[in-house]
């Protein structure tokens, strides 16, 4: 029996008048535009269709046959990627209609219908694998994010992602993190400053790195510095860093870092973030917990497509 999808609860959102599941947060009002992701989806289709197209479907299915299909969850998780799936089908044939039943950001149970499809049978079969590839991967990212978000519930820590994304998929993976209730760190090297260990080594120290940045970028740019010792933390604070990344520190050292910082900078914990450790890290008092594994190693969610 089909299970009803539910949206992960957030006080700032309510269900629509129609009672359909609604996304997690206001950020979802602006998912990646079709123009932005179309090159990614088109590349995936070209890769799959090759030189001759879908030779199996074209040989078996009459050109004028229409079909009705459903995309359904085969395990519990958080949905993401419908925007890419819809575009995949429409690039194959614009007449394919995808109707979401559990929008991106919805929490679903096994058997929940995520979306319905109507249109030419050939187009649905041809676009199936590419569409599902986006859904299973991005839903996996959203689900992994949601698990960490739930694990730190009741603390002040927020879960954020990193630049450790799969090449070409960053905008979609970061969207999937938001679907799971997480936040995005910088999108690229051009939109935020983060002084990392190799910058510090090359520049001759934390203070020297911050001084060089201030001289070039001015006082209005927020500077974040990666540190792995208390001495580096104190140097970063003295030099005026507004945010500090605590790299691979144990929770007890993080607590000490929080006490020393005393609100002078925001603190981000990073490195070795696991489901088992994340609660203790959050309880240290840090503001953010960043995880590269959310995007580079998330397990795919089991989702299938069936004709009905």
Task: Locate predicted features.
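Acidic/glycine-rich phosphate/pyrophosphate-binding loops and surrounding catalytic core
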Residues: 2, 6-11, 20-239, 243, ...
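C-terminal active-site rim and adjoining tail of enzyme catalytic domains
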Residues: 248
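Active-site loop ensemble at the mouth of alpha/beta enzyme cores that anchors a bound cofactor
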Residues: 304-308
């Amino acid at each position: 029996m089909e299970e009803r999808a539910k949206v992960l609860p957030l006080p700032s959102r309510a269900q629509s008048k129609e009672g359909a599941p609604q996304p997690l947060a206001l950020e979802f009002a602006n998912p990646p535009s079709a123009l932005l992701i179309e090159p990614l989806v088109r590349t995936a289709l070209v890769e799959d269709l090759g030189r001759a197209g879908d030779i199996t479907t074209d040989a078996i299915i009459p050109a004028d046959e229409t079909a009705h299909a459903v995309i359904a969850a085969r395990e519990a998780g958080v949905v993401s990627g419908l925007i890419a799936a819809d575009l995949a089908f429409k690039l194959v044939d614009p007449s394919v209609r995808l109707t979401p039943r559990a929008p991106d950001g919805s929490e679903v149970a096994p058997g929940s219908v995520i979306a319905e499809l109507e249109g030419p049978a050939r187009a649905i079969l041809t676009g199936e694998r590419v569409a599902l590839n986006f859904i299973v991967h991005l839903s996996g990212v959203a689900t992994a994010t949601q698990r960490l978000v739930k694990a730190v519930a009741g603390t002040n820590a927020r879960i954020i992602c990193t630049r450790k994304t799969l090449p070409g998929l960053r905008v979609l993976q970061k969207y999937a993190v938001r679907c799971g209730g997480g936040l995005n760190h910088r999108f690229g090297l051009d939109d935020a400053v983060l002084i990392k260990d190799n910058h510090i080594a090359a520049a001759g120290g934390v203070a020297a790195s911050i001084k060089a940045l201030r001289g070039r970028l001015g006082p209005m740019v927020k500077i974040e510095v990666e540190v792995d010792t208390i001495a580096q933390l104190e140097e970063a604070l003295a030099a005026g860093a507004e945010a500090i990344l605590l790299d691979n520190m144990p929770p007890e050292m993080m607590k000490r870092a929080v006490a020393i910082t005393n609100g002078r900078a925001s603190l981000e914990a990073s490195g070795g973030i696991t489901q088992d450790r994340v609660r203790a890290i959050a309880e240290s008092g840090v503001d953010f917990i960043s995880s590269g594994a959310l995007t580079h190693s998330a397990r795919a969610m089991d989702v299938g497509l069936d004709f009905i």
